[in-house]
Amino acid sequence: MNKTLGIYVTSDRHLEKLILLCKAAKKKGVAVKVFFTHEGTRLCTDPEMEALAGIVDVALCKVGFESLELDESKTSLDRSAYSSQSWHAEMIYDCDRYLTF
């Protein structure tokens, strides 16, 4: 059985630690799902986010992103990554372990 780690990101800090954690999990064969919400959606406009491409399954709260008036053109995420809290709820259900930043 594959292991899955869920990461809930509400803070606009610690992107470097998040990236290192995701890379370490991938190296160990652990699938990772990350959901960005509230202030955490600010990280989605950071160019460093590209380091997560192909490593993790990423979604972000569309309402949170829009409420902060962030620029969609500044993110490398695909339009399909914009989601709702229901994705977060499914992530909790599907994951073996769950962390919050």
Residue ranges and their predicted role:
Residues 73-101:
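C-terminal structural segments of small proteins and small subunits
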Residues 29, 55-56, 95-96:
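Short, well-ordered alpha-helix to beta-strand connector turns
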Residues 4-16, 38-39:
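Short, glycine-rich nucleotide/cofactor-binding loops
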